[in-house]
Amino acid sequence: SAFVWHKRFLQCLEAQEKPKRWLLKDPGHLEHIPEILKTYPDARFIHIHRDPSETIPSICSLTSTVRSGFSNSSDKSLIGSQTLEFWKNVLNKYSSNRDNIDPSKIIDISYEDLIKNPLGEAKKIYSHFNFDLDIQTENSMVSYLAQSKGDHKRKHIYSPEEFGLSKEIIQNELSF
């Protein structure tokens, strides 16, 4: 399994100083819940729910940018249909495997709530998983948030239509 290698890689990274816990963000892991649970039985999951009509065009834009570095042609409509189909399959697989996660090891939060109140959502996560949130960590979060205020705003422009999609098509295909 790729996650055996993944675990070894993390162990190499922590050889000098082991962190309290790893926090990894990869939506691509959604389709690998059984493998993750086998490799990391104590894993916790934070499922951030975000409007797919915003995320799919963003992923399409990233894919288009990456492909343009390796190809003279970049069919944006093809990128749109492939991206939508890929994430539809990922989310279907995730939905069928989600019940394998102990409810105490997963929390669902809204992206909008996270943007509006990041510290409150972080506290909710810590509380749900019974993690200690000491004053030093909380102060570090407050400091980081003060320094990065506004950084979450979209930095480039893209639309579903640019990739042969529409908000309605995305919503219909990814409604769970």
Whereabouts are the PLM-identified features?
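PAPS-dependent sulfotransferases, especially Golgi type II membrane carbohydrate sulfotransferases
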Residues: S1-E17, W22, I59-F176
